[in-house]
Amino acid sequence: MQFIQGDLFSDFPELRFIIPHGGGAVPYHWGRYRGLADMLNRPPLREHVMRNVYFDTCVYHQPGIDLLFDVIDINNILFGSEMVGAVRGIDPETGFYFDDTKRYVDALNLSDEDRYKVFEGNARRVFPRLDALLKGRGL
């Protein structure tokens, strides 16, 4: 909520935050944050906050990934994984490893362009020095 109330990104326009684990509770409270911005006469979140805040996909079940992609713009989502991570076991409900987060993203109905954004393009944009290094190596 401090991102909404303050002007951090006006003062530091190149500052970027990547909130791990799908943003935690952020997608669940998105309406609250939008309402707070409106109540405080702040610009919409996409203008005031989302140019600098990103979320990773390190979420351990399909409904969580689905919510993240329903709420957060595709340009603000980066692939993230802890594989082999904190929850290494096999989910008895699915038969797959809990921490195989790529399969949850793969299960989404994404265009090739959006899939590229999540797995590579957004990271290159968020980390321009990495992008320059990779381009320098022909990647």
Task: Spell out what each predicted region is.
Residues 1-78, 125, 133-139:
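Catalytic pocket-lining loop regions of alpha/beta-barrel enzymes
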Residues 55, 66-67, 71-78, 84-139:
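Mid-to-C-terminal alpha-helical segments outside catalytic/metal-binding sites
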